[in-house]
Swiss-Prot record:
Domain BRX as annotated: residue spans: 150-205, 329-384
Keyword set includes Repeat: yes
Pfam family, one: BRX
Name of the protein: Protein Brevis radix-like 4
Record field: compositional bias (Polar residues): 260-270
Disordered: region residues: 1-35, 50-78, 214-270, 304-325
Length: 384
């Protein structure tokens, strides 16, 4: 049953004593009922909380409460409040949806950068960096220091090839010099090196080798653990002086040993390695790439390079190539583990350093060469 709403009279209305049109009242009440039904059908009525302000206003107005049509007015007011709340919720949901969409548009860029950083980290061998949100992300650019030195060859001029080793601390180490047989003989090669020593050292930034800056590799052990490599320290060429004068050599050569001709001194320790260090047997052929390839019978330098399988075999060879008097005047001193020094007493009572032997177990070629450069002065002062 529809309720009737009282209508106030208008001033100056001629028909003020007559009641209002019932059709308009019925239309208003019908409209309010339709609104209530629509809200209930949409489900918004369940989520709406009663408006305290509306209740306060309804309770505070006494005439409306006592009026028989106050329930209809209250229902209209509540329906209006429900529409406002529903409209506000829809606006907030639209705003939240727009914010989520904007975040989703930004996330692919962040994720793309993060994936790119992870791929770079994986390719560089490092661990996968953390998220790109700024929490301790590792820089994907990684500089990997190589543990093993690199060897490279430079052709200084036609027929001259120099092998260098790049040092970790900077600079290069001169390892080997090769001369073409078609363009150089031994004397020409020695003269070329004496004339171009300073230029090569400066041009290729050759540094002095040290144990701290460059780890010396130890060669694999031979089958015989007592095998030793020996060379004569008195034959080691000295570093050329500034005026490049050639130093005379006076070396006593035991009879029966092979000899090489050397009128010029070779001026670098790498050349010492080529001339005075060989891991082969006694009858092995010298390397073709070495400067000490040419053999002559007129010699002032003893370059006998020998490697015996044991200490007894080494002594037997010394007996076969030396006189008995020489053996009686020679003895071996162990300076440190793996280093054996052979000393000979000359007829005048003066001592001579005949050879230094290094154990293969403790010394490689470069290690032995470096040890001799560092301890040469001490050995001469201590034993001679």
């Amino acid at each position: 049953m529809l309720t009737c709403i009282a209508r106030s009279k208008r001033a100056g209305d001629e028909s003020s004593g007559q009641p209002d049109d019932p059709d308009s009242k019925n239309a208003k009440s019908l409209t309010s009922q339709l609104k209530d039904m629509a809200l209930k059908a949409s489900g918004a009525y369940r989520h709406c909380t009663p408006c305290t302000a509306a209740q306060g206003q309804g309770q505070g107005q006494g005439p409306i409460k006592n009026n028989p049509s106050s329930s209809s007015v209250k229902s209209d007011f509540e329906s209006d409040q429900r529409f406002k709340m529903l409209y506000g919720r829809s606006n907030s949901s639209i705003t939240a949806t727009a914010a989520v969409a904007a975040t989703q548009q930004q996330q692919p860029r962040v994720w793309g950068k993060e994936m790119e950083a992870r791929l770079k980290g994986i390719s560089s061998g490092e661990a996968t960096p953390k998220s790109a949100s700024g929490r301790n992300r590792v820089d994907p650019i990684v500089f990997v220091e190589e543990k093993e030195p690199k060897e490279w060859v430079a052709q200084v001029e036609p027929g001259v090839l120099i092998t260098f080793v790049s040092l970790p601390g900077g600079g290069n180490d001169l390892k080997r010099i090769r001369f073409s047989r078609d363009m150089f003989n031994k004397l020409q090669a020695q003269r070329w090196w004496a004339d171009n020593y300073d230029k090569v050292m400066e041009l290729y930034n050759v540094q002095k080798l040290s144990r701290q800056a460059f780890p010396l590799p130890t060669p694999p052990r031979s089958e015989d653990e007592n095998a030793k490599v020996e060379y004569h320290p008195e034959d080691t060429p000295a570093t050329p002086p500034l005026n490049k004068e050639r130093l005379p050599r006076t070396i006593h050569r035991p009879p029966g040993l092979a000899a090489y001709s050397s009128s010029d001194s070779l001026d670098h320790n790498s050349m010492q390695s080529q001339q005075f260090y060989d891991s082969g047997l006694l009858n092995s052929t010298p390397k073709v790439s070495s400067i000490s390839v040419a053999k002559t019978e007129t010699s002032s330098i003893d370059a006998s390079i020998r490697s015996s399988s044991s200490r007894d075999a080494d002594r037997s060879e010394e007996m076969s190539v030396s006189n008995a008097s020489d053996v009686d005047n020679e003895w071996v001193e162990q300076d440190e583990p793996g280093v054996y020094i052979t000393i000979k007493v000359l007829p005048g009572g003066k001592r001579e350093l005949r050879r230094v032997r290094f154990s293969r177990e403790r010394f490689g070629e470069m290690h032995a060469r470096l040890w001799w450069e560092e301890n040469r002065a001490r050995i001469h002062e201590q034993y001679l």
